[in-house]
Regions:
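A binding-site-centric feature that preferentially detects glycan-recognition modules on secreted/surface proteins
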Residues: 1-137, 142-212
Length: 212
């Protein structure tokens, strides 16, 4: 089956719009003068009449670009609560207190991206700006550990934070990794809530790379 071009689809949509207008004219729902009046409006006048289209708010800027950051295939058994060799500077006790110390699924090799926060925002705004299906932006705890081992140079330095979204059962959490003088440290936060993270210190966000 031949795929329609963008021009063909646009022409088809435009033809459908014309047919709809003619049908409404014929049925007396609108007048020719009304159609002519609307068609002669400027772009600004139409926006004032119908309301502006909502602008997409950008919270994140891609840093890794063309870099290939590939996580290993993993069995999913490793958790952050027990990863002392990777996080010698400290592991938040809430990983255990909140019941996150659970194995996950096995994963194949996975490419990831590193983003930088460029607009103050909550976790919901950060990750939601990438797409509404949050499951797509989750890494397993084993993958988060693997990233920190393989690519420590991509973590935000100077004690500032890098965020990783993960899921345990039906609950979303955010692992927060910091590079400290004594090595890496990690704590955990809930995904919800209204805490706004400042973009002035340029926190980073690591997510799975999506196949186009």
């Amino acid at each position: 089956m031949r795929t329609k071009t963008l021009e063909q689809n646009t022409a088809q949509d435009f033809a459908g719009l014309q047919i709809d207008q003619l049908s409404k004219l014929r049925n007396g729902n609108i007048t020719f003068e009304q159609v002519k009046w609307f068609n002669n409006l400027t772009f600004e006048q139409r926006e004032a009449l119908m309301g502006k289209q909502p602008e997409m708010v950008l919270f994140l800027k891609l840093l890794s670009g063309a870099e290939t950051l590939m996580l290993d295939a993993l069995d999913g058994t490793e958790t952050l609560a027990t990863a002392k060799e990777v996080f010698p500077s400290g592991i938040d006790g809430d990983f255990k207190n909140w019941g996150t110390n659970k194995s996950s699924i096995a994963t194949k090799e996975q490419a990831v991206e590193v983003h930088e926060l460029v607009k103050d925002g909550t976790f919901a705004q950060m990750f939601g700006s990438l797409g509404t299906d949050l499951d797509k932006w989750c890494l397993t705890q084993a993958q988060i550990k693997n990233f920190c081992k393989k690519y420590p140079n991509w973590l935000r330095k100077d004690g500032y934070v890098t965020f990783f979204l993960f899921k345990v059962e039906d609950h979303f959490f955010v692992a927060r990794v910091r590079v400290r003088s004594g090595g890496l440290g990690v704590d955990v936060g809930g995904f919800g809530g209204g805490v706004v993270w400042g973009s002035d210190v340029l926190p980073r966000v690591v997510v799975p790379q999506q196949v186009a």
